[in-house]
């Protein structure tokens, strides 16, 4: 039996806080900015790739986490290599009713970040519930290839 139910929710205009400034934070950020959400990203060291992202819905703070950053946040994404920080911040967030995604600990997740396939009017997500990221990405790539092939064939009819 599963603990997590796969459903789509309206996140329009919601606020996400990403704690972390590296590769995983960058991937999460790029995914989120495909949707109509606001993102605050905070980290003492933000990667050059993230700094290059220009978006009016993004606020970057190159500093250590402070509890005040949880104000008005709906969802928290923890993407650092500091497990103690993740534990402390997730506890603060949950006390405020904020859902948590911890990129380094699936047991500390209230929601998962799936691989997303979007093509025309299709939006498909694939997840292994944090168990096998490589398999998830492989399956998502197979689906992408199939959808590209299928939509090309359908248009030629």
PLM regions: where:
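A short, basic/flexible loop-to-alpha-helix module at the beginning of a structural domain
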Residues: 1-11, 113-114
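Hydrophobic beta-strand scaffold residues
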Residues: 39, 60, 99-100
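ADP-ribose/adenylate-binding Rossmann-like module
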Residues: 75-79, 86-112
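Adenosine-phosphate binding glycine-rich loop
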Residues: 117-157
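Glycine-rich, highly charged phosphate/nucleotide-binding loops
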Residues: 54-69
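Glycine-rich adenosine-cofactor-binding loop
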Residues: 7-33, 135, 157
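Residue-level detector of alpha-helix initiation sites
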Residues: 23-24, 84, 130
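NAD(P)-binding Rossmann-fold cofactor-contacting core
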Residues: 35-53
